[in-house]
Curated annotation (Swiss-Prot):
Residue segments, region Disordered: 751-779, 795-957
Protein name (record): Vacuolar protein-sorting protein BRO1
Composition-biased stretches (Basic and acidic residues): 751-766
Species annotation: Cryptococcus neoformans var. neoformans serotype D (strain JEC21 / ATCC MYA-565) (Filobasidiella neoformans)
Listed GO CC annotations: endosome
Biological process according to GO: protein transport to vacuole involved in ubiquitin-dependent protein catabolic process via the multivesicular body sorting pathway
UniProt key word Heme: no
Compositional bias per record (Gly residues), positions renumbered to this chain: 945-957
Domain of life: Eukaryota
Function: Involved in concentration and sorting of cargo proteins of the multivesicular body (MVB) for incorporation into intralumenal vesicles.
This protein's UniProt keywords: Coiled coil, Cytoplasm, Endosome, Protein transport, Transport
Lineage of the organism: Eukaryota, Fungi, Dikarya, Basidiomycota, Agaricomycotina
Ranges in coiled-coil conformation: 449-493, 585-626
Amino acid sequence: MSVQSPLIAVPRKTTTDVDWATPIRHVIAASYGEDPNSYAEECAVLQRCRQDAVRGAGNDQTARDLLYKYFGQLELLELRFAEIKVSFPWNDAFTDKLTTQTSLAFEKASIIHLISSILSSLAQSASRSDPEGLKRAYYNTRATAGMLTYINENFLHAPSTDLSREVVHLLIGIMMAQAAEIFTEKLVEEKKSASLVARSANQTASMYTSVVDEMKEFQGKGVFDRNWLYVLQIKAKLFGSLAQYYKATSDSAAGKHGTALVRLKIANSLIQDAQKQASSFIYTFVAASTPSLPHDAANALNEIVKAHATVCGEAKEQAVKDNDLIYHEVLPSEASLPAIEKLPPAAPITIQDVYGNQEVTKLIGPDIFLRLVPLAVHESASVYSEEKAKLVRAEVDKVELAEGEIQAGLDHLNLPEEIDRWRQFLEGDTNDDVPLSQQLKSLVDSVGDVRQVENDLGRLDGERAACERELRELNGALDAESRECERMRAKYTPNFTQSPSGPQTANLRSNLSANLSALSSASTSDAHLQSLWQSIQPSISLLSSGPSNLERAARDITEGNPQKIDKTVSLLDLDDEEVDRKALGQEEKDALRKAVDDGREKLDRLKKIRAERDEVLRDLKEKIQTDDVSNLLLLNRRSQNVEPQLFASELEKFRPYQTRLAAAVSASRSILQELDMLVAQVHKGTGFREILRKEKDRQRIIRDWEKRLIEAGESYAEIRAGLGKGLSYYDSLRRVIEDLRMEVQRFTNSREQERRNMVSDIETRQRLGGTSPSTGGVVANRGLEERLAALKMEAPPQPPRLGTTSTPNLPPPPGRGSSNVTSSYLPPPPPPKPQSNPYDFSTLAGFGSFATPSVSSPQHVYPSQPQQAYNQQSYIPPQQNPYYPPPPSRPTYASPPFAPQQPPMQSGHSPYAPPPGHAPQPQQPQYPSSQNQQQRQGYKYPGYGQQGGYGGGYGQY
């Protein structure tokens, strides 16, 4: 064909601008609770997108692309603003009547109708003489039918004529008939078989005939252009004639000349009718009044019909001649002719197929309101994120488990160190250096100078001796004062009324006795420290000599040098043939060399597999991290129960990563098993097994030696801690002794002054009275003095019991307390408190003679009857004796009860018990001793949790 058959295009709908921004802002503020101003740019983009699609474009591909984009954005917009109300004005494509609705569905249907119009125009303008143009025309006509089909299936209530089901259905029929026409043209152009062309032409004629019948129902309604009907009628007869013509050609080729002649007559008759209509159509067609048809539609159609009429006429005349002269076949009737088969028509291209194209997806671009995600989509996305997290956790757990198995297996097999040792055995490059443990190296750095320990031990002995000497001197001072008092009493009986010093010094003697007892226990702890130091001194000296000497000693031990090894190492543990390692045989060397190569190769493979596995896991994590299905969830928001299937299909994207991880884990386990078998095979060798045995013995000896050194280091730390605590104890005890000395001196000085005053008063009265002591009294006094001189003081009283105070109760000052005793007379102290710990400072809270007396304390009242031990006369209170001198001033004892300040300990707490007589301190936690202290044989620390020693011993630190 030299002329192209005209095609009908769908008329275009028209519209005016709408306001998208205001309704969208209202919905964002009301439904999403966000700031509408933050989406001003998105609203402007949507507004421009509509203007470009419906106003600025023509009938070219650019217009089609803009409409594709706008409709795609409408689909996404409806997922977020389904109930939005915007006024959409559209003019009817056939009646030009304005229709305005606020539904998004009306806007979408109008845009699809406009897309179908653009597609039909593209099909109409395509050059079908070119194969590519013919394909585009065929595709666009089918796509137009698909768009119109979507309108009929999804928009049931048409607000305008052009969107009504009947009109849309007719347009679909026209588009499908034109698609069949284009396909028939393609078959003719490609010179396909006559029977195939006949079937296609018959199908096209049938479709045009059906459309003509449908269009006749709209006659007089002013919907369709009447020129459409002329074109459709002409084409129906034209393709009917073509079908008969090509069928006749097929029958003639099959030898059915009579049937072929009848069909040619039918074809000629149909084309003659079409030619008459085409001739009249030329005079009635006005191109300007029918923009949906090409401007040359009448002429082109007339030329096509005329050309086919000529062909049919010539073919009929030739067939008549041939039949009359040659074939002489009887011509069958037209009714008896078999019907021509119809070629099944092509299906319309659906809108899903159009938008499923990657190029169309790119045209649509990203969602304009991508930042605005509905809450339901957020919830579904969270569920999907949790599914992804489960997948990642499962894979990570598998990888970590596999890595743990690999690491444990390598540690169990001692790889790769074991392979290096095999290589050393082969090369004879055995390392005689003995590796020392990190704990032992740290111990060497912490030992320091041991001479300080010896100095501290000597200082400890000196402090203890000085404290004991001073305590005994104080006891002697109290004894001397008591003897002097009794001597004066015997001499001046009965006028000597000074109270006995025994009750007043009971508390002082109790404190002195308790401190002496604690000092005895401390001496035991000091002896224990000295003994412990002597037992570990060789080991500590070795540790303090430095790392180089320590390594040298370790080598001496492993080499079995009896002159150099540590005395703590048993010579029975050393092998006389340690140095002479048994050489491997040649066969074992070859096997070992092969094992070294195999082991290295397997370790390299294992390393690569682990690296690849970790890299795949990282890629999986990154892929899952960047995966986002919010858009898919938004697109499938209207579907019910789609999430499980959607999630399952999306998670399948990560299946390749899971497969690679599983393969890596399986390969690593296989290599680990091979390494295990390799090590076991090497260890089965006789020579190698003997070497391993000796190496194990060597390591055992070194470990035992290190263990003994470490235990010595722990004991050294205990000694240093005990020395610090012991010296601190003696410092505290020295302060307590100093306070006791001051109290004893104050007490003896006061008593001596009181005696001098009393003796002076007695002698003055005797001189004034001219009397002298009776002979019996003198004799008695002399006898008493002799007995006192021979009297040996007993041991001081026992320390006070727990829970009692060591503070004696002094009488109140004159005028405020009882008047029947002197101010220097003190009641007996409470029962002594037994000492549970020699360094327990709790007994210093109420230190004896330093406390202010309590008025409620019991007072001693001497009986009025003569006493055999001291006086022979009744006691005369000082207030009733005019010759008795005024009582001496009351000693200025410390108030509140004496509690000397303790020096702060290093850690703020002292586990040592303070000396007896010291103020009680809050009980401090006792630190448990290390486990090896209880297991150490050969010595045991005294006083650990027991009485005596330095308050539980020096071991508690």
